[in-house]
């Protein structure tokens, strides 16, 4: 039994490259289950944020999974980061959960996105006991680390940093237009409403 984590980051792929790895909400579950089956993986966890896409596979045969990934051409390999030891997978996912490699160091939205991705993966039954247990441990340890006194009071996200910057530089009469109803825009709007 082995893990394989394939990670794509905006630094290597750019936003256009990452968008090619995104799935519509309507088809995501089916496409991910098809990917899992086509590659011969036992379990699959998928996380997509604005700066990264992560695929965590659990398999009985790592060599076969790698061969299937290589021949299927379903995932680009030239811009991917690979983690195959359990230790490297855990370290990478913990760094992701703690936003150590994000636009804003320590950004608190990523942990919530990881939890949501976990719940969605449970819902469409792509997880099994191995991957589910691993993600639960990552969430538990990340929450524990985030609750440390020095980290607990840091409320950082791209949205709050941008909104804070706007309130410091803009005037009270400046008009703002939000395009899109995504989580980042909603958070920025709440922050500006509260403090602007």
Model segments located where?
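Conserved short-loop catalytic and cofactor-binding motifs
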Residues: 19, 150, 176
């Amino acid at each position: 039994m082995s893990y394989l984590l394939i990670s794509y980051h905006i630094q290597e792929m750019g936003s256009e490259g990452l968008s090619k790895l995104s799935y519509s909400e309507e088809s995501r579950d089916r496409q991910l289950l098809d990917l899992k089956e086509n590659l011969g993986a036992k379990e699959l966890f998928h996380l997509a944020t604005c700066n990264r896409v992560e695929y965590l596979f659990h398999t009985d045969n790592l060599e076969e999974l790698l061969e299937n990934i290589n021949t299927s051409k379903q995932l680009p390999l030239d811009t991917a980061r690979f983690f195959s030891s359990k230790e490297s997978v855990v370290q990478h996912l913990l760094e992701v959960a703690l936003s150590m490699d994000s636009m804003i160091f320590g950004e608190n939205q990523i942990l919530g996105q990881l939890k949501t991705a976990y719940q969605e993966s449970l819902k469409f039954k792509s997880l099994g006991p191995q991957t589910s247990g691993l993600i639960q441990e990552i969430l538990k340890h990340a929450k524990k680390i985030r609750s440390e006194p020095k980290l607990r009071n840091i409320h950082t996200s791209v949205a709050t940093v941008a909104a804070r910057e706007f309130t410091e530089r803009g005037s009270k009469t400046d008009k703002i237009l939000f395009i899109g109803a995504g989580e980042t825009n909603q958070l920025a709007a709440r922050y500006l409403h509260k403090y602007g």
